Swiss-Prot record:
InterPro entries: Band7/mec-2_domain, Band_7, Band_7/SPFH_dom_sf, HflK, Stomatin_HflK_fam. The chain crosses the membrane at residues 87-107. It is a single-pass membrane protein. This is Protein HflK. It is found in: Membrane. GO terms for cellular component: membrane. Residues 19-47 have a biased composition (Low complexity). Residues 374-400 have a biased composition (Polar residues). Gene3D superfamilies: Band 7 domain. It comes from Haemophilus influenzae (strain ATCC 51907 / DSM 11121 / KW20 / Rd).
Length: 410
């Protein structure tokens, strides 16, 4: 029975090495060595990896364990000590390098960095490469060059108790990053509410007709001024760049009437512009005519003055002759005056020695010749005098009429 148990291998020491029995003597061979070797190789292939051995090998590579001489591999791996004094400095050095590298950051050109140290405002950093202690500082980048735009709209009550729908946009940008982040909870939302409040205040102090027609620029300027006064008290770090009054619409019930009123005002402005253009066109012409008349008047004045001076000079030259022969000079002046007066006047020459008592003047010929030589505007429409015909048989002798002569008397 014992022999059978020995052959089956049931009496082996369970703590011995695989393939070695308790009764095996050195130098003795067993009949079942080949079977035991095959069985041992199968057990080694099916057993899980040794976790302790893997951990000890890792410690050896890190320098935490030393191999003892004169011992087997299994016993040396199980008894290797763990040296924390060498592992901790290495881990601290690696962690410090990672911590330092992780602290580098970059701020863009259009941004400013707000540094918080343990949650408290510390400083403002400029664009470029910067460094912060990780887990100590926190950096919040804020764009200070971007122009932002917000839009507000709604139905508002005017001064004359009418409703009007208005729309306005505000362009702004960040001026102080720290105040923008920490002065109020939300600076953008606060600006939106301030814009709505300023717009309602301005609309409430204007009539609906002014808002829809000529008061658009007034609404824009007053809203901008009121908005700056509101945000100044909050000190939000924002700068309002521009305010644009987009549109204003009346309620749908009265929209047609307001459209007609606006069209009439536009026509009025158009007529005014056309009248101003006509005035600008005619004004230079009128100024030119006025200048021409002034120059003609000046020339006429100079001519009259010169003529008068010449006449005075002529009379002064005749004065010695008048003193020497007054009668002769008087007759000469009379003749010259009559020449001027009678030069363009029709004349009839009569013979005074004729004893005929009846003299018939050819008035029709005289008047006809005068109408031909006179200007068309002269009053010449009166009928010529016709001598009444005599009823008696008296035949007058033909009258000799001297030819008409113009010019100087002989």
């Amino acid at each position: 029975m014992e022999n059978e148990m020995s052959q089956n291998g049931s009496d082996r020491d369970p703590w011995s090495k695989p393939g070695q029995s308790n009764d095996q003597q050195p130098g003795n061979s067993s009949n079942n060595n080949g079977w035991n070797n095959n069985q041992n190789r199968g057990n080694q292939e099916q057993s899980p990896p040794d976790i302790e051995e893997i951990f000890n090998n890792l410690l050896k590579k890190l320098g935490g364990g030393n191999k003892k001489s004169g011992q087997n591999n299994g016993s040396s791996q199980g008894n290797t000590p763990f040296h924390f004094g060498k592992v901790i400095p290495l881990a601290v050095a690696i962690g410090a390098i990672i911590w330092g590298v992780n602290g580098f950051y970059t701020i863009k050109e259009a941004e400013r960095g707000v540094v918080l140290r343990f949650g408290e405002l510390h400083s403002i950093v400029q664009p470029g490469l910067n460094w912060k202690p990780t887990f100590v500082d926190k950096v919040l980048p804020v764009n200070v060059e971007q122009v932002k735009e917000l839009r507000t709209q709604g139905a508002m009550l005017t001064q004359d108790e009418n409703m009007v729908k208005v729309e306005m946009t505000v362009q702004y940008r960040v001026q102080d990053p720290a105040k923008y982040l920490f002065s109020v909870t939300n600076a953008d939302d606060s600006l939106n509410q301030a814009t709505d409040s300023a717009l309602r205040y301005v609309i409430g102090h204007m009539s609906m007709n002014d808002i829809l027609t000529t008061g658009r620029s007034v609404v824009r300027e007053n809203t901008w001024k009121a908005l700056n006064e509101i945000i100044k008290s909050y000190d939000m770090g924002l700068e309002v760049i521009d305010v644009n009054f987009q549109s204003a619409r009346p309620p749908e019930e009265v929209k047609d009437a307001f459209d007609d009123a606006i069209k009439a005002q536009e026509d009025e402005q158009r007529f005014i512009r056309e009248a101003e253009a006509y005035a600008r066109e005619k004004e230079p012409i009128a100024r030119g005519d006025a200048q021409r008349i002034l120059e003609e008047a000046t020339a006429y004045k100079d001519r009259i003055v010169l003529d008068a001076k010449g006449e005075v000079e002529r009379l002064q030259r005749l004065l010695p002759e008048f003193k020497a022969a007054p009668d002769l000079l008087r007759e000469r002046l009379y003749i010259q005056t009559m020449e001027k007066v009678m030069a363009n006047t029709p004349k009839v020459m009569l013979d005074g020695n004729n004893g005929n008592n009846l003299t018939v003047l050819p008035l029709e010929q005289i008047m006809g010749k005068k109408s031909v030589t006179s200007a068309p505007s002269a009053v010449n429409s009166s009928p010529a005098f016709t001598a009444p015909e005599r009823q008696n048989s008296y035949q007058p002798q033909p009258t000799t009429v001297a030819p008409i002569r113009q010019g100087r008397f002989n």
